Amino acid sequence: MTEPATPPAPVSAVRIDGPWTHRDVAANGARFHVAEAGDGPLVLLLHGFPQFWWSWRHQLTALADAGFRAVAMDLRGVGGSDRTPRGYDPANLALDITGVVRSLGEPDAAIVGHDLGGYLAWTAAVMRPKLVRRLAVASMPHPRRWRSAMLSDVKQTAAGSYIWGFQRPWIPERRLVADDAALTGRLIREWSGPRLPDDEAVEVYRRAMCVPSTAHCSIEPYRWMVRSLARPDGIQFNRRMKMPVRVPTLHLHGSLDPVMRTRSAAGSGEYVEAPYRWRLFDGLGHFPHEEDPVAFSTELINWLKDPEPDR
């Protein structure tokens, strides 16, 4: 006898109350949920896997208090955003992001991305440079660096083994939501350093993963990233990413990140023809913005306010 399926969570589960406002914006043929706080220059925050906009809750308030308009968006297919049947390649997801910038009525934004959100932030800075004022990336190397590390570094290939597991049809989705998304919680705990997110936060992420179609849409970008390696569209994307990033860039990484090795992330500055700042957080894992939100927010805000960020 099979075990009963995990009951789906309502979309309202991701519209969590706090010192921010929720709204929906249209961009690139879809509807995107955002949480917004503060007034000032726009800072757009992009979450990673297996999370949603709420991972930036600490930075939303810190940035608002520092005089910025902080907006955390749910990526396509996640949280409160539309779950479309296609459109999960990084080039299109980057157009989602820059489209949201325009829909928010701003000429440009400082884009801050973590994990998959970081991959897309790098991409947006190359594809739509006029809409990206500054770039900050956490826990993710430049896409070309990611590609070379995954293909040539045995230790990085092993560290990112979950991505290879995502290539099977349907099984990964079922595993992510089984037993009230227990695997989602386990991944967050295993990928964190000693200051892992508390049990309450992990429960929020587990519940969000149980919103219908979230698991499938969350892993579709990773399927593209692997399956396109030898396809014309993937080769074309990799060539396009040779174009240098020409905006000031802050690269943040946890020294204990078990998913993206420090060696893999470091060196991404070779793709930046602008001031590039690398900061390694000692003792933090894959989620530095949640593991030590004060240190992360301080580093980010100081850099955003620096009129001439150093290399």
What is the meaning of each model-derived region?
Residues 52-53, 119, 284:
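A short, glycine- and basic residue-enriched loop/turn
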Residues 55, 96, 217, 295, ...:
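Charged catalytic carboxylate motif
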Residues 49, 141, 287:
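Active-site pre-Tyr helix/loop in NAD(P)-dependent dehydrogenases
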Residues 284-293, 297:
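Catalytic histidine-centered segment of alpha/beta-hydrolase-like enzymes
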Residues 27-36:
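A short loop-to-beta-strand scaffold at the N-terminal edge of the catalytic core in hydrolase folds
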Residues 35-80:
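Conserved HGGG/HGGXW glycine-rich cap/lid loop of the alpha/beta-hydrolase fold
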Residues 2-23, 32, 71, 78-112, ...:
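Flexible "cap/lid" subdomain of the alpha/beta-hydrolase fold that forms the substrate-access gate
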